[in-house]
Amino acid sequence: MNKYKQYFASDFHLGAPNYDSSRDRENQVVAWLDFIKDDAAEVFLMGDIFDFWFEYRTVVPKGYIRLLGKLAELSDAGTKLYFFKGNHDMWVFDYFKKELNMHIISDEMEMERNGKKFFLHHGDGVGNGDSGYKLLKKLFRSKVCQWLFARAHPNLGVGLANYWSSKSKLAKRKEMKFEELELNWIKSLEVSLTQKGKKFDYFIMGHRHFPMDVKIGDNARYINLGEWINFKTYAVFDGQQLRLEHWKPES
């Protein structure tokens, strides 16, 4: 089977809000990966795949065996895998690289596929503004913060994280609506990059949890990948067109 497509997904938030809900979602993600494995040249997991993740030197959070096993299967079959650090799983280090041959992306990634240019980012703290969050993100990613957290016993550190996951507001969200003002930041980013001589066809991100595919600038498109608690959306590029699609188990 010819592997020629690029697939993009984000915000699985595995671990939230509880074990049963997360396991059901993990099974659906695995079914989706199984569905795309024959034609997937590359799979981009674009942040907040886990509601929490921290790699101690010799310990990783337990669980997610089905997902990791399926990713290993894809990697062994020649599919390239990319993991973007999100705001919930920014403490991914080298475990996935060693075990899954996965490329770990800390911030943005710029690439070209079949003549189309892509700007990829989880979506947190990108563009102008949001200086408070950017400072907090820098603090959490610092070696000092990571060292301090690693001093806590995994039962305490992961236990606290799981407690906060159980309070996830995302799982309780019933209705969302799109506001045009929410596009100002991505429009500003597109203009800023264009002024620097960088033109992109697609800006693909997650983080904001609302699936959308809208035109920005002259010819660019902004695709938000949504999330998998309420929407189960993903994007696929077949070398000609990029589409935002909904995963249905019966598909």
What spans do the regions from the language model cover?
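N-terminal short leaders/motifs
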Residues: D51-L74, S168-F200
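Active-site-proximal loop/helix segment associated with metal-binding centers of metalloenzymes
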Residues: G123-S188
